[in-house]
């Protein structure tokens, strides 16, 4: 009988219950340590994508403004990216009036450069479908002098002031958007 028992032990292939419990415990510890880091990484990549999308729209507006074909008016162009409402680019003319002819030109220029289905109106472009919404809903709203007027809540945006001489200044909201620390 002892010979039969010893022979079975030699032929036994596999893991014991204790070994399996130890492996499961090690995996649980690793998941517990790495899961928070993974979620931080995912959120950071979402914010990076949002900042990149906003910067791309700002660059395209600069391209359109520098091309005499599109007759970009002097005024303030406000870009707002929202988690729920998509993206809107709005022109507020310095004189308070918006010329339909030149508005049609800059909206046509922006529509031709930006991908997606943009809806054009007299003084704005908008995209409300899921193509260009914020990926992250954890942005901290800017307050005080740092805020762009129409950027509220967890939205991000930029205000581009085009002077009569064509010079452009850009203000981001929140201001930490440019440095990626928000």
Residues covered by each model-derived region:
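N-terminal leader/signal peptides at the extreme start of proteins
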Residues: 1-13
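Short, flexible helix-adjacent loops and helix caps
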Residues: 6, 43, 69-70
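Aliphatic-rich helix starts adjacent to a transmembrane/signal segment
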Residues: 11, 39-58, 65
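N-terminal single-pass transmembrane signal-anchor helix
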Residues: 12-38
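Alpha-helix exit/C-cap motif
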Residues: 59-84
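Short, surface-exposed interaction loops/tails
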Residues: 82-85, 90-95, 101-102, 117-120, ...
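Papain-like cysteine protease catalytic cores
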Residues: 105
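Long, charged/polar, surface-exposed segments that mediate recognition or autoinhibition
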Residues: 109-110, 114, 122
């Amino acid at each position: 009988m002892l010979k039969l028992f010893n022979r079975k032990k030699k032929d036994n292939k596999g893991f014991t219950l204790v070994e399996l419990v130890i492996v499961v415990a090690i995996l649980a510890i690793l998941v517990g340590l790495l899961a928070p880091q993974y979620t931080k990484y995912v959120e950071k990549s979402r914010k990076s994508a949002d900042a990149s999308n906003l910067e791309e729209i700002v660059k395209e507006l600069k391209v359109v403004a520098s091309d005499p074909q599109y007759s970009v008016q002097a005024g303030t162009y406000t870009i707002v990216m929202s988690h729920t409402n998509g993206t809107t680019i709005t022109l507020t003319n310095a004189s308070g009036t918006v010329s339909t002819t030149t508005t049609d030109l800059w909206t046509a220029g922006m529509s031709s450069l930006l991908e997606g289905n943009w809806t054009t109106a007299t003084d704005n472009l908008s995209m409300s479908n899921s193509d260009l919404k914020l990926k992250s809903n954890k942005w901290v709203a800017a307050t005080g002098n740092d805020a762009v007027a129409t950027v509220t809540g967890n939205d991000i945006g930029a205000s581009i002031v085009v002077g009569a001489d064509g010079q452009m200044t850009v203000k981001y909201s929140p201001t930490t958007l440019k440095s990626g620390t928000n």
